[in-house]
């Protein structure tokens, strides 16, 4: 393996998580180093079973020269319950990668593995930031004009008003640090914009956020149909609704792309029209490719943890790596603590 300089940002990688590990993971690291992180001095602490990972590492000299491999004896499985992973998977690649943040070996971690286990182990090993009750899963979502931040995406199926309040603060800090929005517009997801709409929890969270309106750019409620119009920068909701919104959005984007491909293959004229439109369509619709927006951060933990989609290919995983690197560079947790204070 290569000699890592002290000034290098070290990222821990769970090489065993995901549907296509370790090939997509190591290939994604290579893509990230060659295309997305060329201006940064990055190294990887790669955790996994040596008989699985080392043959793949041998194919990628750039990754091999910028990484340290750590052999682990166990793997968190996709169907492991969080409680089981906490009890029985202490020797897994996921656990060891997370623990490297606690020991100071790594500055952040990325994994395609079991979401519930990743959150449970991260909370147990790293703990939460001061004044944070529950971490939230957060990502940036493409829209008509610019990306917006959406949280929670599934960590908390049910939330208290205070948790939603904390999510709003954390989401605002994330938008400032990662999206470079100086004064992000924050809104609660609801079924209408009137103050009387929504559940009791949502209305109570609304009241809490109104009390600090001068310190946070709170814009009230936003409906799902308005999220992608650039009206707000941060959309806050519970994990159930957030997960549904994200998956429906990804499904719609995929369906539209599929329908268009079928339409332009129906006749010679359609194929010719598709050929003429292709450059403009690629330019306008490529930003909605979910692979380019892969990587959800677990906000509120005492460490930078990023979840990559379980079915990530090399491109998708590379973008998740970019998320964890950016979070470390922007010192996102320090900014969250500052905002809360």
Curated annotation (Swiss-Prot):
Its EC number is 2.3.1.274. The keyword Methyltransferase does not apply. It catalyses: a fatty acyl-[ACP] + phosphate = an acyl phosphate + holo-[ACP]. GO terms for cellular component: cytoplasm. Pfam families: FA_synthesis. Keywords: Cytoplasm, Lipid biosynthesis, Lipid metabolism, Phospholipid biosynthesis, Phospholipid metabolism, Transferase. Pathway: Lipid metabolism; phospholipid metabolism. It is found in: Cytoplasm. It is an enzyme of class 2 (transferase). One of its GO terms (molecular function) is phosphate:acyl-[acyl carrier protein] acyltransferase activity. GO terms for biological process: fatty acid biosynthetic process; phospholipid biosynthetic process. The keyword Lipoprotein does not apply. Homodimer. Probably interacts with PlsY. Belongs to the PlsX family. Catalyzes the reversible formation of acyl-phosphate (acyl-PO(4)) from acyl-[acyl-carrier-protein] (acyl-ACP). This enzyme utilizes acyl-ACP as fatty acyl donor, but not acyl-CoA. This is Phosphate acyltransferase. It comes from Ehrlichia ruminantium (strain Gardel).
């Amino acid at each position: 393996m290569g000699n890592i300089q002290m000034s290098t940002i070290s990222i821990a990688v769970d090489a065993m998580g995901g549907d296509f590990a370790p090939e997509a993971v190591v290939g994604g690291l290579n893509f990230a180093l060659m295309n997305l992180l060329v201006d940064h001095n990055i190294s990887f602490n790669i955790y996994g079973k040596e008989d699985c990972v080392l043959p793949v590492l041998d194919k990628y000299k750039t990754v091999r020269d910028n990484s340290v491999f750590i052999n682990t004896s166990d793997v968190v499985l996709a169907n492991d319950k969080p409680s089981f992973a906490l009890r029985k998977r202490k020797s897994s690649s996921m656990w060891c990668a997370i623990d490297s943040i606690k020991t100071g070996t790594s500055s952040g971690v990325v994994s395609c593995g079991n979401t519930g286990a990743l959150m449970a182990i991260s909370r147990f090993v790293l703990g939460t930031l001061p004044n944070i009750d529950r971490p939230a899963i957060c990502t940036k979502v493409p829209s008509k004009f610019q990306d917006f931040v959406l949280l929670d995406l599934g960590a908390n199926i049910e939330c208290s008003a205070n948790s939603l309040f904390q999510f709003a603060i954390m989401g605002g800090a994330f938008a400032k640090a990662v999206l470079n929005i100086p004064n992000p517009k924050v809104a609660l997801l609801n079924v209408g914009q009137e103050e009387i709409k929504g559940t009791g929890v949502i209305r109570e969270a609304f009241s809490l956020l109104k009390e600090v309106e001068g310190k946070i750019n709170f814009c009230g409620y936003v409906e799902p149909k308005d999220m992608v119009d650039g009206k707000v920068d941060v959309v806050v909701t519970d994990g159930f609704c957030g997960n549904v919104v994200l998956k429906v959005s990804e499904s719609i984007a995929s369906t539209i792309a599929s329908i268009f491909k079928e339409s332009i293959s129906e006749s010679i004229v359609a194929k010719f029209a598709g050929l003429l439109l292709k450059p403009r369509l690629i330019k306008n619709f490529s930003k909605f490719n979910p692979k380019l927006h892969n990587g959800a951060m677990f906000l509120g933990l005492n460490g930078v943890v990023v979840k990559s989609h379980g079915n990530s290919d090399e491109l998708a995983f590379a973008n998740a790596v970019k998320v964890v690197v950016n979070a470390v560079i922007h010192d996102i947790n320090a900014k969250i603590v500052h905002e809360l204070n």
